A protein has these predicted regions:
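Phosphate-binding/catalytic loop of phosphoryl-transfer enzymes
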Residues: 84, 98, 135-243, 361-372
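ATP-binding/phosphotransfer module of carbohydrate and carboxylate kinases, centering on a glycine-rich
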Residues: 1-60, 64-109, 113-130, 165, ...
Length: 372
């Protein structure tokens, strides 16, 4: 029977455990330096962690003076966490150890059967200690006060319930675009990016806002819900609720395509991928539509930049990642707002589940430290 920590760790043991989780492997002197603790204090902390079955020795390191020191890592019995991207058309998951090691991942295009995929994955983890926590990413606002919007709260609850996660496991829920922004912060390829906007353009639109390496959620959990921006903002026309998303989301793009496509343009494209593919091959009508769409997305980016001045906008989503969109967004942004770098996400469709995994790992380590 694996040993766990049924009660909170001492303050020093908690610090050492958290540092070892991020360092993956370390000696006691390295942990003492990382935690700014004395070597005797670290030794006592390590004894506590070893007794709890949370850490184990993993070889020996030899210094320049010839002295050797035991290397430690988290024990398998420390447990693992689960991250789920609960989309409307697909569900993906990752299970990771508390040191960040990937244990398993998979996806399905049958959301109503995702519980079976995830249940099987958890059964395969019986030798990896307890499941400490789960984070589920959803395509809705996650409300601090569910009474503020019971309809949205119920939709989120149903999405989580459909996964049939173990009842004893703490579950945190986060917006999918926010998760993608967290992934860009940690895995996007530039360790110096600490303030940026992740702008997702796909079936819907949304923004994840990171300021000083911290995700901005807002009072209602709705920071970045750009679908609610007033649109259109022009004389003689009243803005509609989420009208901007109706214009810039994939369904809106395809409605526009259908309204202007002519017989001489060839077969009507059935999805944005076809429109962009035709534009890439020099199709005049498709090229004009893509240019117009890029300009509209650029206006949205300019609105965000005018308020936040992030210095960097990262484009994501099925449409947002298309390179044909990027130049138009850059041109529009340059014409309307402050100097801002525009990049395309390199994480692709995995961004949301990667970000959820980072959150789950944070929660999991904290659960061990606090004895939750």
């Amino acid at each position: 029977m694996p040993k766990t920590a049924p009660s909170p760790l001492s303050e020093s043991a908690g610090e050492v455990f958290a540092q070892l989780a991020w360092l993956v492997r370390a000696t006691r002197p390295q942990l003492a330096a990382a935690c700014a603790l004395s070597k005797p204090t670290v030794s006592v902390a390590m004894s506590e962690l070893e007794a709890a079955g949370l850490v184990e020795r993993d070889g020996t390191a030899h210094g320049l003076t010839g002295r050797s020191a035991a290397v430690y890592r988290l024990a398998r019995e420390a447990g693992y966490v689960l991250a789920v991207d609960r989309g409307s058309t697909q569900v993906s998951f990752r299970t990771i150890a508390l040191d960040g090691s990937l244990l398993d991942e998979d996806q399905t295009s049958q959301p109503d059967r995702a519980w079976s995929m995830i249940g099987g994955a958890l059964e395969r983890r019986t030798g990896d200690g307890p499941l400490r926590t789960a984070v589920v990413a959803v395509s809705d606002v996650v409300l601090p006060d569910q009474a503020a919007d019971p309809t949205t709260a119920e939709r989120v609850a149903q999405a989580v319930t459909s996964l049939r996660l173990p009842q004893a496991v703490p579950v945190a829920v986060e917006n999918n675009v926010n998760c993608a922004a967290i992934a860009e912060l940690h895995d996007g390829g530039d360790e110096h990016r600490d303030t940026f906007v992740y702008l997702q353009v796909g079936v819907g639109i949304g923004a994840g806002i990171v300021i000083g390496r911290r995700l901005l959620r807002g009072r209602n959990g709705a920071a970045g819900e750009v679908a609610r921006l007033a649109y259109p903002w022009t004389d003689g026309r009243e803005p509609g609720r989420e009208a901007l998303e109706a214009r810039l989301g994939s369904p809106g793009l395809m409605r526009l395509v259908g309204s202007v496509w002519r017989n001489g343009d060839g077969p009507l494209p059935q999805d944005p991928e076809e429109v962009f593919a035709l534009a890439g091959r020099g199709h005049e009508r498709a090229g004009a539509l893509v240019a117009e769409h890029a300009g509209e997305v650029g206006k949205l980016a300019a609105s965000l930049v005018s308020v936040l001045d992030p210095g960097l906008v990262i484009l994501g989503g099925g449409v947002g990642r298309n390179p044909l969109l990027t130049d138009g967004v850059r041109r529009t942004l340059a014409a309307l707002s402050w100097p801002t770098k525009v990049e395309v996400s390199r994480l692709g469709e995995r961004a949301t589940v990667l970000g959820a995994a980072h959150l789950a790992r944070d929660h999991g380590v904290n659960a061990v430290v606090t004895g939750a």
